[in-house]
């Protein structure tokens, strides 16, 4: 019995053995990513796919300055409001900037027909040629061309639009007029004009010397006849009369004809348009700065090569796609706080590793060994490099596929098109929701795949070592093996590089394994004896206890004992 107890004590004595473990890199990163199954997973490395910053400035776009309308609206600029005179010389731009509530629009009150459509057309124009379609001095010899209004005053004096002429009677007459222009510019030409609606018949007679005036405008694609509406109206800018403004695009080779016997606000300058689909109109109060950018938003410029942004849905230039997400981060490294249990959609399990190694800094996966010569970490460069190449290619592919940069400007609707505008917003919101969902789902799936990919690589490295060692070592958990033989540094290196010589160490391993197995058998015998003794002893204690209780109860009358023969 003394021998058996001695053997039992020996089995609990710690013995030194050479070991090798498979593990992965860890660091002090606090980056977190989301996956399909988990949120806020801490990882060693990740890349951001969502741009959320801007410089708060208006910048040149690829070296070309924007057209800043300042206190002028698009209407004031294109009609030639006298207060917008500084804009007349501007003929090219990268984009157009309008403030939210510009003061100088149509100085003479009235209705601007299809104004939102005109803005839409101008949003795709990057330059134009302003030219005199009907020269002021020679086109209207029988009419007065100096009509002005106090509502369009400039420097304290009555004035009028720079691109229009207010024709009135001359020498008490207003002869019928007919004027045409043939477009020979090889570009679309924007032509603007107006029709005056006096507040009373007296003004009508004084200005045009007729009570039954008309204005006719005809081209291949446009035909309309206007009749002045003479009526008293509420004063706007101290005017009871109104001017309604109209426009059309004249195709190359087409001719536009103006006929009237009164009330015509004639075109003086027209615009030969050059389209540029990278242009647009934005509404912004951001200040102009000496900066250059590839992407401009109303809030500021974005200088980013990322595929997504959440700064603003309206963009001009080469811009990331707008999404409503607040976080789109793609993992490139490994879990920094790994889970022990099995996980993953794609079958990879590395749960046998409880923690990463901060001591291994030269690779993602590798080894830690311990023997009589010491201990140390070593990265598996081949598997690490293969993983880096694969993940880098995947990230680049995702960015390339999703990084379709473009301009996204708002659509224009007038007050009578509110239902259409609301419907358009709902459609745009629907597309935006789809884009956001697709972007988030893509990142979640790829993050799940990447983490499972790392798990799989660690598992493969473990299996590679296991297949080499076979029964020359035993698995002791936590990704480690304990050798049945002495394994010096040269031996450890052969395991790492896949050249481990199994037969060389098999005999030593067999002897040590048999010794250990013998100890296990002796231990089993001891355990069996102890188990029998324990069972018998506990049974005797139970019987003695029951007997004592029964005797006591019989002696005090609590229990009657009858013996029948």
From Swiss-Prot:
Membrane topology summary? Single-pass type I membrane protein
List residues in topological domain: Cytoplasmic.
550-565
The note filed under miscellaneous reads: Major glycoprotein, comprises over 80% of the envelope proteins present in virus particle.
Organism the protein comes from: Influenza A virus (strain A/USA:Texas/UR06-0195/2007 H1N1)
> What cellular component GO annotations does this protein have?
host cell plasma membrane; membrane; viral envelope; virion membrane
Q: What is the lineage of its organism?
A: Viruses, Riboviria, Orthornavirae, Negarnaviricota, Polyploviricotina
Q: Where is this site: Cleavage?
A: 343-344
Q: Does the keyword Transmembrane apply?
A: yes
Q: What is this protein called?
A: Hemagglutinin
List all membrane-crossing ranges. 529-549
Q: How does it assemble?
A: Homotrimer of disulfide-linked HA1-HA2. Interacts with human CACNA1C.
Q: How is it modified after translation?
A: Palmitoylated.
Q: What is its main location?
A: virion
